[in-house]
Amino acid sequence: MSLNNLENHKSHIEKYGFAVINDVFSQKELEDINLVLQNIDTSKENFRKSEDLFVIRQFLKEVPEIKDLVFNENIRKVVKEIFGEKYFVVKSIYFDKPETSNWYVAYHQDLTISVDKKLELANFGPWTTKQNQFAVQPPLNVLENIYTIRIHLDDTDENNGALKVVPKSHTKGIYRPETIDWTVEKEEICNVEKGGIMLMKPLTLHGSNRTTNGKKRRVLHIEFSDIELPEVLQWSERMNG
C-alpha cells in the first residue's frame, strides 16, 4: 500500500463517496485471517446461512480472535489518516457470497446504525429489530460522519459481486434509488484485488450483481464514526480499533 497516496484517497472519497486501495494485506496476513474464518462455529444465532449468502453480524464481537489480524498497520493508518484520530468501530459484518450465488443487491444507501436499545428520540427513526439487535435511522449528520471499510478476501469484479456505485451521490442527502436520473448520474464498478480495500461513505448509492463467473466473494464490512450519540443511546458494537 502506498502511504504517500493516502491524501489522494482521502480527497477521492470526500469528492466521489468511495475509493479503492489495493495491497493493504499481505499474503501471510490473508492466510491468517482465512484460518480463523475456516474454524468458525457457524451455528450461532447472529450467523445467517443460505445457498446464496453467509452473513455474520457483529462480526468483530462474534469472532474476537480476528480483530488483531484485521487491524494491521495499514488499516490503522487508513483510519487515522483518512477518517480521523478519534474514529472507532460502530458496526461489522462478514459477507461470504459463494461461487454459485444468485444474490444481488439493488441500489441503496446504508441508512441505519446499530444501537443498544429502542426508545423514543427526536430525529431517530424508523426502527428495526433483527435477532435482538436494534437498528435505527439517525439524523443525517450522523450518517454523513460514518466511513466504511470493505476488506476484500478475494479478487472482486463485476462478475462476482463488486460494488457498483453512483459517484457523488453521498452529497445529496437521503437519495431514493427509484428517483435516480440515469441521464445525469453514472455508474462505476469498484473492482478490488484480494487483500485490497474499498472505502465508502454510507450515503453513496451502491449495489451489486449476481455472480456469473463461478468465483466466491468474501468481504469484511466495518463502519467507523467519531460521533457520540445522545447519552441515553449507545453504539451497540462500539469498539476502539
Question: What label would you give each PLM region?
Answer:
Residues 5-8, 13-16, 25-194, 207, ...:
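Non-heme Fe(II) oxygenase catalytic core, chiefly the N-lobe of the double-stranded beta-helix
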Residues 17, 202:
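Glycine-centered, phosphate/nucleic-acid-interacting loop/turn motifs that mediate DNA/RNA or nucleotide
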Residues 239-240:
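Glycine- and charge-enriched low-complexity intrinsically disordered segments
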